[in-house]
């Protein structure tokens, strides 16, 4: 690349970042149309961090401290939540831009450098969670950010650089080290995917300077976090990860690993990946083919662990194959070109949805939407999406018991010896949480920390109850925060009735004494006290 090309690449990336951020701010708010549960989970964590709480130390989550910190920073600075979300994403994009620019201009030819740079910026600032669905969603932004960082790291590790010499190797190592540290502090599964590839790349190149740079920057970030949060942070982080790994509440959020690899949505991508490995090796690019093969298990694992199982990694595969096919003097170029274009075509719906999302949100501002959160926080949804609460009740038919229908019914949840209806909350989560929280407050129980017997616990966002110190915004198992709870809220319709049953069972097994204080068609409110034998 000439100097003018490098400046043009930086300008193009900055233009994508600036245009998307401007569209987000110009809309005057954000207008999500799905994933309310995940959105409220994100809001809880952001408010915790904006108040100075640390993940793992002050509340339970498998997500790292950086998964929501950019948004929390701007909330803490006084911005409304919607504005803070857009500015936080812009900050992520600005932080990624120099690293992505370096990787693109040093590893990729001009057209693919621009495609890669634009894709990384879209992953940073989109208003959809890296899926092909066009509806605006504020959930799982950390997955997009982690994909962007992972792609930068993989491009540097897998593809050969144009620059030789110690300075270039140190620069590559420093960027990869910072990227690995960021992945560890966003979502650990991405780190698991990246580390083997980086380690193998450094080993094959016998790059001692690069390895030292990776270790130095990575350990430097760990030291900074330790100084800020204390050494107990890492122990608590590991404890949360182990607790989630052991739970059977949500072992994986979508398809099985076999379906991710060989199901109708995944088999084409899997075949393209192995084709790229084979063609790279046939063309003499043995190192690149081996490193892509080493990356495959991690890419599959991340996809398997992510909600929706969307094969975002096909973007990297397309860039990889099209870069190698353009290399002079290499055979199998046509096959690599077909493979690369095939990968980009498969991932195109995701890229288009991300590119359109700021404009879709801008156009949505004319919709008659209402505020989701108390105050003018700028997150707005259609009234029917908030107020129309839909539930599903499992019940046996009046006839047909002789065919074993009763055995297939979910086990009844008992509260104080009486069964709760097997009712599941399907939609209208915001309206449900708001109404129940306000009713608890109006009944004279407001301002007290509540343990919620459900997977989601966003009631405290609406003012009726207080947040639970040490609790879990998204339940994965155990009784996190129970020592600080003054009340237990049992929803009559739960987001996960099996989780409701599990929490009540664990409270009973732990010897806690529950006393009914209030019962409505929507919830049961209980006082909680330890038994005489409890260490509490």
Task: Outline where the language-model segments fall.
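Membrane-interface micro-motifs in multi-pass membrane enzymes
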Residues: 122-158, 259-267
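Hydrophobic/aromatic-rich transmembrane helices and adjacent perimembrane loops
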Residues: 146-149, 304-372
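Start-transfer (signal-anchor) and selected internal transmembrane alpha helices
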Residues: 1-23, 112-115
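Membrane-interface alpha helices of multi-pass inner-membrane proteins
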Residues: 169-188, 194-199, 220-223, 295-305
């Amino acid at each position: 690349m000439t100097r003018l090309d490098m400046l043009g690449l930086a300008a193009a990336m900055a233009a994508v970042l600036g245009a998307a951020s401007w569209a987000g701010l110009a809309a005057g708010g954000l207008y999500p149309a799905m994933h309310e549960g995940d959105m409220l989970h994100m809001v809880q964590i952001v408010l915790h961090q904006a108040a100075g709480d640390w993940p793992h130390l002050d509340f339970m989550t498998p997500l790292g401290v950086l998964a929501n910190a950019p948004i929390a920073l701007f909330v803490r600075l006084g911005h409304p939540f919607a504005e803070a979300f857009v500015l936080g994403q812009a900050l992520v994009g600005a932080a990624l831009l120099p690293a992505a620019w370096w990787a693109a201009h040093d590893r990729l030819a001009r057209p693919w450098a621009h495609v890669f740079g634009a894709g990384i910026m879209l992953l940073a600032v989109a208003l959809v969670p890296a899926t092909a669905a066009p509806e605006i969603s504020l959930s799982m932004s950390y997955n997009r950010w982690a994909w962007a960082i992972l792609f930068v790291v993989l491009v540097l590790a897998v593809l050969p650089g144009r620059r030789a010499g110690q300075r270039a190797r140190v620069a590559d190592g420093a960027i990869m080290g910072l990227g690995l540290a960021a992945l560890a502090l966003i979502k650990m599964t991405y780190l698991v995917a990246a580390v083997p590839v980086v380690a193998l790349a450094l080993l094959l190149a016998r790059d001692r300077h690069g390895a030292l740079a990776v270790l130095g920057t990575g350990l430097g970030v760990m030291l900074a976090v330790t100084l800020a949060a204390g050494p107990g942070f890492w122990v608590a982080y590991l404890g949360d990860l182990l607790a989630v790994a052991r739970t059977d509440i949500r072992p994986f959020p979508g398809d099985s690993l076999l379906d991710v690899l060989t199901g109708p949505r995944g088999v084409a991508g899997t075949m393209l990946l192995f084709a790229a490995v084979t063609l790279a090796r046939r063309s003499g690019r043995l190192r690149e083919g081996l490193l892509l093969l080493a990356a495959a298990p991690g890419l599959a694992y991340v996809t398997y662990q992510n909600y929706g199982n969307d094969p975002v990694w096909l973007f990297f595969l397309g860039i990889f194959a099209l870069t190698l096919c353009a290399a002079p003097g290499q055979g199998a170029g046509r096959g690599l070109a077909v493979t690369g274009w095939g990968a980009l075509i498969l991932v195109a719906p995701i890229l288009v949805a991300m590119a359109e999302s700021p404009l879709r949100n801008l156009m949505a501002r004319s919709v008659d939407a209402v505020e989701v959160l108390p105050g003018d926080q700028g997150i707005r949804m259609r009234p029917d999406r908030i107020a129309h609460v839909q539930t599903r009740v499992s019940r046996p038919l009046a006839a047909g018991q002789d065919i074993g229908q009763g055995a297939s019914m979910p086990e009844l949840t008992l509260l104080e010896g009486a069964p709760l209806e097997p009712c599941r909350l399907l939609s209208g989560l915001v309206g449900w949480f708001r109404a129940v929280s306000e009713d608890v407050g109006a009944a004279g129980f407001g301002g007290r920390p509540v343990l919620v017997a459900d997977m989601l616990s966003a009631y405290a966002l609406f003012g009726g109850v207080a947040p639970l110190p040490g609790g879990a915004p998204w339940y994965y198992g155990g009784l996190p925060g129970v020592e600080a709870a003054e009340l237990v809220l049992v929803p009559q319709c739960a987001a996960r009735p099996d989780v409701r049953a599990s929490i009540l069972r664990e409270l009973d097994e732990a010897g806690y004494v529950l006393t009914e204080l209030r019962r409505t068609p929507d919830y049961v409110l209980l006082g909680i006290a330890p038994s005489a034998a409890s260490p509490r």
